[in-house]
Amino acid sequence: MATLRSLLLAALLWVPAEALSCYGDSGQPVDWFVVYKLPAHSGSRDTPKGLTYKYMDQNSDGWQDGVGYINSSEGAVGRSLQPLYRKNSSQLAFLLYNDQPPKSSSARDSTGHGHTKGVLLLDQEGGFWLVHSVPRFPPPASSGAYTWPPNAQTFGQTLLCVSLPFTQFARIGKQLTYTYPLVYDHKLEGFFAQKLPDLETVIKNQHVLHEPWNSSVILTSQAGATFQSFAKFGKFGDDLYSGWLAEALGTNLQVQFWQNSPGILPSNCSGAYQVLDVTQTGFPGPSRLTFSATEDHSKWCVAPQGPWACVGDMNRNKAETHRGGGTVCTQLPSFWKAFQSLVKDWKPCIEGS
């Protein structure tokens, strides 16, 4: 009887584990979200400089003000990454990669690897892919806590999180053999290493060895939304956007990227589709918040007439034509509308380009 009573009590006290997925600003699981960390100058006087952000997910109907600040573990990014820093993470697998890894990690900056930043966090049911533009982020699992790096406060940044079934991570693994990320922290053991051999390859600093030097795959989210990943290896030898993406999507593109680096590629109208460098971004609403591309480290692009929009980790400059990297695109109407509304100005093509 005592044993039965104990079992009943245990059943009453048992709480099922939270599903591993992206978590939104609402504190609830979401299929996907985008966080746009705003440049430091854009905050009001009574808010911390460089920590405010805009947010959207499948339920938000466009951009909203972020809940709290980007350095909070209660917001979408911090809450989604919490499982990484918990002590009971034995049933998880993860990869943290960044061409500019956190200074607390043993990895060094590397131009030999791809210009690519992201997080894979999963269990045997599924998890999420966080594609972002943030240097020195996130902290390694051993740090024990989510933090936002001080170096990433000044400029704008983008983070796209997509919740995915386990089956999709083999496809992501294939893509990472093209982008050739610098992995600075990982855990891929037993079941995960067996089922995801391409991720094991990536952890061992290996990459694709033969043509083609680019790859695209369809990814289906936990809720059935369709995303398309585009990945290129350094030997592709061309700009991601004008050399491949515009033609692959069959559309003109307006591209936001970091324009303070050397060798910036000008707007390109030499092909069937125009690829135009965005120079000014602005959010809708009474504040009329606008900022220059020189204040914005984010990487995204949008088809001016629809239906595509993409968030990734590559710039348009000469050096990155010879580095791996990629972007994740979708035709979700709300996603496209949100990014299309941001473009306020761009550089026209000069004659002959």
Swiss-Prot record:
<keyword id="KW-0378">Hydrolase</keyword>
<keyword id="KW-0540">Nuclease</keyword>
<comment type="function">
    <text>Hydrolyzes DNA under acidic conditions with a preference for double-stranded DNA. Plays a major role in the clearance of nucleic acids generated through apoptosis, hence preventing autoinflammation. Necessary for proper fetal development and for definitive erythropoiesis in fetal liver and bone marrow, where it degrades nuclear DNA expelled from erythroid precursor cells.</text>
</comment>
<dbReference type="GO" id="GO:0050776">
    <property type="term" value="P:regulation of immune response"/>
</dbReference>
<feature type="active site">
    <location>
        <position position="297"/>
    </location>
</feature>
<keyword id="KW-1015">Disulfide bond</keyword>
<dbReference type="GO" id="GO:0006308">
    <property type="term" value="P:DNA catabolic process"/>
</dbReference>
<keyword id="KW-0217">Developmental protein</keyword>
<dbReference type="GO" id="GO:0005764">
    <property type="term" value="C:lysosome"/>
</dbReference>
<dbReference type="GO" id="GO:0006915">
    <property type="term" value="P:apoptotic process"/>
</dbReference>
<protein>
    <recommendedName>
        <fullName>Deoxyribonuclease-2-alpha</fullName>
        <ecNumber>3.1.22.1</ecNumber>
    </recommendedName>
</protein>
<dbReference type="Pfam" id="PF03265">
    <property type="entry name" value="DNase_II"/>
</dbReference>
<feature type="disulfide bond">
    <location>
        <begin position="22"/>
        <end position="161"/>
    </location>
</feature>
<comment type="similarity">
    <text>Belongs to the DNase II family.</text>
</comment>
<feature type="glycosylation site" description="N-linked (GlcNAc...) asparagine">
    <location>
        <position position="214"/>
    </location>
</feature>
<feature type="glycosylation site" description="N-linked (GlcNAc...) asparagine">
    <location>
        <position position="88"/>
    </location>
</feature>
<keyword id="KW-0053">Apoptosis</keyword>
<keyword id="KW-0458">Lysosome</keyword>
<dbReference type="GO" id="GO:0043353">
    <property type="term" value="P:enucleate erythrocyte differentiation"/>
</dbReference>
<keyword id="KW-0255">Endonuclease</keyword>
<keyword id="KW-0325">Glycoprotein</keyword>
<dbReference type="InterPro" id="IPR004947">
    <property type="entry name" value="DNase_II"/>
</dbReference>
<keyword id="KW-0732">Signal</keyword>
<feature type="disulfide bond">
    <location>
        <begin position="269"/>
        <end position="349"/>
    </location>
</feature>
<dbReference type="GO" id="GO:0004531">
    <property type="term" value="F:deoxyribonuclease II activity"/>
</dbReference>
<feature type="glycosylation site" description="N-linked (GlcNAc...) asparagine">
    <location>
        <position position="71"/>
    </location>
</feature>
<feature type="disulfide bond">
    <location>
        <begin position="310"/>
        <end position="329"/>
    </location>
</feature>
<feature type="signal peptide">
    <location>
        <begin position="1"/>
        <end position="19"/>
    </location>
</feature>
<feature type="glycosylation site" description="N-linked (GlcNAc...) asparagine">
    <location>
        <position position="268"/>
    </location>
</feature>
